[in-house]
From Swiss-Prot:
Gene it is expressed from: COS8
Taxon lineage: Eukaryota, Fungi, Dikarya, Ascomycota, Saccharomycotina
Signal peptide: none
Protein's organism: Saccharomyces cerevisiae (strain ATCC 204508 / S288c)
The protein, known as: Protein COS8
Transmembrane segments: 43-63, 73-93, 238-258
GO biological process: protein transport to vacuole involved in ubiquitin-dependent protein catabolic process via the multivesicular body sorting pathway
Amino acid sequence: MKENEVKDEKSVDVLSFKQLEFQKTVLPQDVFRNELTWFCYEIYKSLAFRIWMLLWLPLSVWWKLSSNWIHPLIVSLLVLFLGPFFVLVICGLSRKRSLSKQLIQFCKEITEDTPSSDPHDWEVVAANLNSYFYENKTWNTKYFFFNAMSCQKAFKTTLLEPFSLKKDESAKVKSFKDSVPYIEEALQVYAAGFDKEWKLFNTEKEESPFDLEDIQLPKEAYRFKLTWILKRIFNLRCLPLFLYYFLIVYTSGNADLISRFLFPVVMFFIMTRDFQNMRMIVLSVKMEHKMQFLSTIINEQESGANGWDEIAKKMNRYLFEKKVWNNEEFFYDGLDCEWFFRRFFYRLLSLKKPMWFASLNVELWPYIKEAQSARNEKPLK
């Protein structure tokens, strides 16, 4: 009987611990219907929104007291249309300022919880920071980070990338002041965890080698590279553009021959550039895809052009099997694969400031250098 009671007590303790752990990791994504409703709630709770709403009180009094309705109307329209814009800007700046005040606590959470590159590992960090910010009156709600991914993104854009781009200690101290030692410790913990991921990834990769039978590069299937590019960029999304082009041709007659010629040329270059960027966006959806690309480059035994051809074949098969790309034609040939590496990976090592439209992939810098060394590329000037 006593043994059963002891077992029951233990099971209750385990259940209560799990419940506490679950409660600890509840995030706004579990509370709100979607990110839009969370965003609207945050705006509604902000001081800027309340000030904007209070502005309507003196405006309504002005409307009643003024004999001329034109001036109140103009001011009301300005407040109506420009007000939301300023509210959004002020809220964004407030979030940035609040986070910058708690960099030390941010670093402590990372050092303690040791999250990896997997967004799910950031759930505890996000939940703890949400509670800490609210309890210490850094933020006026319990929902600063919507989910783990937003917390991970904040870490990269606020700490990892800006700090890694600072090459000398004086620049780091000037930007981050007393937070420098805490940031260094947090980045070391994160880098060590990522290195373990990299080694585990390579071990698993060795256990499941590529099946390269019956793989041919697009250069062997298409007569010209231009044909391959045209097949990629001309699809239903381009249909409105070309309908617009034919409309211009029909309405302009013979008056504007230059526009007739320039429009398709410009659109071709724009769509080609978008296609190249789209490939990187697709590859960046998961960290494992970028790790796979770099690992394939590092471990390729063939050298020169043949080596890049083999890398292109392996990546074409991998991305198709992982349903990242809808066919085995991600890279046209080895030269295209080499250009892609230089453009979207190797170039990151020479950047001096963060990119607003893409990640710097700081975690991958050591492996990008290793891949560059393995392919015997010339160093950037």
